[in-house]
Amino acid sequence: MAEEILNREYEVEYEGRKYFLRPVKAWVLQPPGKPGVVVALFKLPNGKSIRKVIMRLPP
């Protein structure tokens, strides 16, 4: 599943512009007692890095 997430392109919006990017890194964030989410780190063409939730996990 991890390879599937990293090889797919996602639409990322930053400062009003939309980019189709592949994540550099992805991880699961799941606080105790709450449903988890998959967060991904994207590198923009201008050199900045942003994080975005790309998937919600079932409870």
From Swiss-Prot:
Name recorded for this polypeptide: Chromatin protein Cren7
Keywords on record: Chromosome, Cytoplasm, DNA-binding, Methylation
Source superkingdom: Archaea
Subunit structure: Monomer.
Principal place of residence: cytoplasm
InterPro entries: Cren7_sf, dsDNA-bd_Cren7
Entry's Gene Ontology molecular function annotations: double-stranded DNA binding
Post-translational modification: Methylated at multiple sites, to varying extents.
Its job: A chromatin protein, binds double-stranded DNA without sequence specificity. Constrains negative DNA supercoils.
Compartments in which it is found: Chromosome; Cytoplasm
Pfam families reported in the protein's UniProt record: Cren7
Homology family: Belongs to the Cren7 family.
One Gene Ontology term, aspect cellular component: cytoplasm
Gene: creN7
